[in-house]
Amino acid sequence: LGTDGVTRHVDAVLAKANSLEEEGVSSFIMSGGYPVPSPTLTGSIRSDIAFIEKVRGGKIAIADHRVAPVSAETLLAVATEARIGGMLRGFIGMLIMHIGAAAEGLSCVFAALERAPHLGRHLIATHINRSPFAFSEAAKLVAKGGFMDISSGLNVQTLGPDTLKPSEAIALAMRQGVAKERILMSSDGNGSAARYGDDGSVSGLGASDLGSLHTEFADCVKEGMPLSEALC
């Protein structure tokens, strides 16, 4: 889930994943959403992962005006929920972190990893091509064992002039020595995309485009990336 954990529910996400499976599309979900405590199906991210086959991790939002500031202690608690849930199921439980535009960046993440470096491999920072700063923060996370997730639907037209084009962000990460296994790309497909005016007020709402994933994959190849690397 995203901003709306009130009128939208994790059970609806699970139902959609099950319907996609019936149509032949492999699907998994992450429990939780922007708010803390996390909206869940069974009362915790840990038990959601342990008891529900399709749940592979959790979600949280940091550095975003739509959530209260997240402390290192809160991040440690939520990441540990995902970790232990995965241990009970026999895989690595992941925590996807929505990264907003606030100036603190991933400071709470780095503070948490100072105390619990073993959690690094459970963390995915998403929307990191929203700005050069977010990208650099994600690169630091990768150095601590985490993953960077580039949003294929974010570009100058959809977010603003500081946005890194997804295919270019992937190429930049690889030039900087980020292992391709640590670089992800997702569409955020059909997720709400608010447009803001200069005064910070919401001027409109859109939805992230599923087709952007294919577009940026094709651009990676057109811009010189070997097909085998783009597919990874």
Could you tell me what each predicted segment is?
Residues L1-G85, I99, L106-A112:
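Active-site loop-helix segments enriched in His/Asp/Glu that coordinate
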Residues V10-L14, P69-A72, A103, G160-S167, ...:
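Electropositive phosphate-/nucleotide-binding environments in soluble metabolic enzymes
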Residues S26, F147, P226:
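Residue-level detector of anion-binding/catalytic polar loops
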Residues R66, E81-A194, V202-S203:
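Active-site core of metal-dependent hydrolases
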Residues R175-C232:
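His/Asp/Glu-enriched, well-ordered alpha-helical/loop segment
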